[in-house]
Every structure is written in C-alpha cells, then in structure tokens.
Amino acid sequence: MNDTLRMKKWWMLMLLLTVVGINDSLAQAAPAAAERDVTPKYSNEFLNIGVGARALGMSLAQVATVRDVTSGFWNPAGLTGINSDLQIAGMHSEYFAGIAKYDYAAIGKSIDSVSAASISFIRFGVDDIPNTTELIDAGGNIDYDRITTFSAVDYAFIFSYGRKGFPFGQGRAATSSAGSGDAFRWGVNAKVVYRHVGDFAKAWGFGLDAGAQYDYKKWHFGAMAKDITSTFNAWSYTLDERTKEVFTTTGNEIPVNSLEVTLPRIILGAGREFNIKKITLLAEVNALMTTDGRRNVLVSANPVSIDPGLGLEASYNKVIFLRMGVGNFQRVKNFDGSDAMTFQPNIGLGLRIKNLQLDYALSDIGNVSDVLYSNVFSLKLDIVRSDRK
C-alpha cells in the first residue's frame, strides 16, 4: 500500500467520522430541542474568536499553514512544526471599548522527531457587571450602596497532540515546507470548558477536535473538525429566594438546569508559497462550515452554512512580516429594509528577533463591517537547550 493510497483512506476516514459525528449530534439534540433550544447558534463562541495576531491579521486563514504552538487552537496537526525544546505564546486583546477582555496562553513541546504536544488556556470575560437585584430595599427605597458587581467569564483548557506520518502503517513522515516531497500530519484535541456568571450560574463542558495537514511541493492543504462529537455544556443555576422573587416581579424567567450542545464545525483550507530570493509570499484560503443552521454568511443554507476567509503574508528573510486578510462576510439588513453584504478587512505586522517573535494585528480597518476594530498583540518565544544551540 503506497503513501498516496494511505492518505486518501485517512482523508476519507476523517470525512466519515465528521459526518457520523454531525448526524449523531443532530440526532441526540433533536428530542431535547423539541422541549428547549439546547443547540443555540454561537454556543461557546468565545472559542471561535481566534488566537495569535498572525492569524487575526490573516482573517483566521490558518488551518493549512499553521506550524507553531498556536496549532493547538487552529489545527493540532501543525504542532509538528515546533522545532525548539519549548515554545510559548501569549496574547491579550480587548473588545467593545475594553468591556470584554480576551487572554490566551499556550506552551508546546516537541516530543521527538515526529510528534509534539501542547496545552492552551483561553479566558474571555466581562468583569465588574453591576448586580442590581438588591437595588431596592425592603421599604421600597432605591439604595445605590446595595449594588454589587460580578463577572461573566468563559475558560477553556485545550490539550493537543500532533504527529507526522499516516496513522495506519509507517507512511512517509518527511517534512516538505521547501518542496522536498510530500508530508502528512494529523492531530487531536481534548478540551475542557468552564463558564460561569457570578455565583448564579456555571457550566462544564468537554469536547474533541481532529485535524490533518498535507503538503505537496509548495502547496499546503488542511482540514479541521471542531467539536467533532459535539461539545456538551451542563448548566447549573444557584439562585437564592430573594433573587427568584426579583426575577418573578420583573417578569424574567427563572432558569433551570439544562444542557447546551455545541454542534460540529469543519474548516477546510488550502495555501501556496511563492519564493523570490529572500522574500516569501504565502496565500491561504479557508472555508468554515457550520452545522447549527442557517447563518447570515456568504453561503447561507440549512443546516450547513459556509463562511470563507482569505489571508496573505509576505516575509523578508523570515524576520519582517506583513499580513492582510479579508473575511467575516455577513448579510445585514439596512435601516431602509434593503439587504447588504459586509466584510471585515484586517492587516498585521510581525518582527522576529532571534527566538522571540512579536506580532500585531488591526482588525476591521476602515470600520467597513459592523464589528468594532481591535488592536491585538501577541508574543511567541522559542526556548532551546544550551547544548543544542
């Protein structure tokens, strides 16, 4: 059995597992959804914002060409691109004029010549939210001193493993970023999600991802199946009698323990490298396919919608980087009732000094889309043992 046949069988297996996972998830969600909507759109959406200023500058087009510790988020197959003993990355960004804060940190390690692993941490939170349930005292008087604050925070821990070669048989595990042959890589994620809203509500969730990458000369191909078996978030609520009374008086529904299901999404990508002396040009296009029903994206259908993204990167001697991208195509309705298509253009810069890389991205330049612009900075550090330098 040659490598090409193994590769085809592996891609077919990934596709089959994804389809089976989607069908099984929809089948499990349907009975419960008849009583309560347990498969809402944008479930665990904080896990789809993206990590790394490089990726954000390229409009999230990463699944085929990512090769560093951020692969634990984008495609665990790319972890095999870690060449140092340890690689550490971090990012901080703020949204909605600083109201929401997004933090990311990851550490990855090359296990041997064909495998690598990483641990990633993500926090997305809104802090200091006023709690006005006790604003009015027993005498009916407004007392602002009774206002307290709480936080609504989402956490995720992602444990990733990537490996070169085909899972079935030895296959060919040679790297080929410079066109020296073809290479296949695969990877898996196990993620734990914890979300809480003050002391009132909390949820635990668990999910699995699977990804693969394949290089042919200067072409790169990738596939990522997120929440391949669906991610189940078990919500529990703790409300005291006073809070329940306030909810009833103000016409709010008292929440009950429930199960929220995050349905699978598939990302397909293709990229191409162009080398001109010390200048390297990289272009990648991704197609994000969601399975949670019709969305207002470029290709809108039920249950699968497709949102494309395009990213470009130019580098000089792998030291200075200039990036741009376009994505987040949205169908929006104007005030006059007409429909319009918006998109989000991004740009980015990068600078590598020895083992340290600093990246910057500016999203939604020119305020073209309905999304507010954001400035994003990220760092990446390679740690190499002194005996290997």
Task: Give names to the regions the model predicted.
Residues W11-M12, N75:
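Short linear interaction motif-like sites in intrinsically disordered regions of transcription factors
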Residues M12-G21:
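Bacterial N-terminal signal peptides
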